[in-house]
Amino acid sequence: MGNCLHPAELSPSTQNSSQLNSEDLWNFSYDGNDSFPDVDYDANLEAAAPCHSCNLLDDSALPFFILVSVLGILASGIVLFMFFRPLFHWQLCPGWPVLAQLAVGSALFSIVVPILAPGLGNTRSSALCSLGYCVWYGSAFAQALLLGCHASLGPKLGADQVPGLTLGLSVGLWGVAALLTLPVTLASGASGGLCTPVYSMELKALQATHAVACLAIFVLLPLGLFGAKGLKKALGMGPGPWMNILWAWFIFWWPHGVVLGLDFLVRSKLLLLSTCLAQQALDLLLNLAEALAILHCVATPLLLALFCHQATRTLLPSLPLPEGWSSHLDTLGSKS
């Protein structure tokens, strides 16, 4: 069979036996003066050999999954604590309820990372794996949609600006994200104790729907935001979507959406890879894109902290001080 680094090699005895059996069958089946073109059995056997790829996210990657999960939970918890503590003034951030939901989505993703991690034993059920993929992609879809709304509406998402707007958008966006996870939830399960998507002809429609959803949310949505920003600026129609550091979130999921779409095209035979090296490169890109997407649960709280720090540093000097603070400062000034 070979391994993931070296293709399978046939021993001389295997090659000779294969040639002998084929020649015997040929002579037995046809008896006459018909001439047939020569067949290169060695080339045929080499072409039929399986293509092996190294899986970067195998059992040896378990420490990576655990570390990212722990860091993501801690970072998201700290960010949520700072959002709901008036001492840090993070509630001054424009659209802070939406930003808090981004931290919630990141925390949910961090929690299910160990469920889908390899190397934790062979006791996971298909139901648990389906639930894991549901939360995995549901939280990611919700975060992407929340970022799109935050960029499009910006300061209008404040609780005092439009009452009920934030609540209605939140319910709607999380509902859409839940619906988008149905295909991958139904087309995933446990195989050999590992959680993995199930690829079969019966589930091809679900796989196609999931690939299209990832392409639309992770790839087309940020491209649309950038396009709208550039178009409005070129036509002088206003500032367009609100661009800020939070847009860096899409860097972690954009490759996943692209490579997942390519993988579906290859599995559906709509895109043919002529060499084993091309297939190995695609498998490597799939693993790297998945690892990058997993890292978003650590990066998202950091992006939120940076954004809120910049926003509060800009807004705090322009806000009036409380009466107690102002009188205290006046007393200190008179003493000096």
From Swiss-Prot:
Q: Which InterPro entries match?
A: Duffy_chemokine_rcpt (IPR005384)
Q: How does it sit in the membrane?
A: Multi-pass membrane protein
List the Cytoplasmic topological domains.
Answer: 85-95, 154-166, 229-244, 309-336
**What GO molecular function annotations does the UniProt record carry, in alphabetical order?**
C-C chemokine binding; G protein-coupled receptor activity
One Gene Ontology BP term is: chemokine-mediated signaling pathway
Q: Where in the cell is it found?
A: Early endosome; Recycling endosome; Membrane
Question: Which of the residues are on side Extracellular?
Answer: 1-63, 117-129, 188-207, 266-287
Q: What is the name listed in the Swiss-Prot or TrEMBL entry for this protein?
A: Atypical chemokine receptor 1
Instruction: Relate the protein's function as given in its record.
Output: Atypical chemokine receptor that controls chemokine levels and localization via high-affinity chemokine binding that is uncoupled from classic ligand-driven signal transduction cascades, resulting instead in chemokine sequestration, degradation, or transcytosis. Also known as interceptor (internalizing receptor) or chemokine-scavenging receptor or chemokine decoy receptor. Has a promiscuous chemokine-binding profile, interacting with inflammatory chemokines of both the CXC and the CC subfamilies but not with homeostatic chemokines.
Q: List the disulfide bonds.
A: 51-276, 129-195
Its gene name is: ACKR1
GO CC entries:
early endosome; membrane; recycling endosome
This protein's major location comes to other
Transmembrane regions = 64-84, 96-116, 130-153, 167-187, 208-228, 245-265, 288-308
Tell me the keywords, alphabetical order.
Answer: Disulfide bond, Endosome, G-protein coupled receptor, Glycoprotein, Membrane, Receptor, Transducer, Transmembrane, Transmembrane helix
Which family does this protein fall into? Belongs to the G-protein coupled receptor 1 family. Atypical chemokine receptor subfamily.
Glycosylated position list: 16, 27, 33
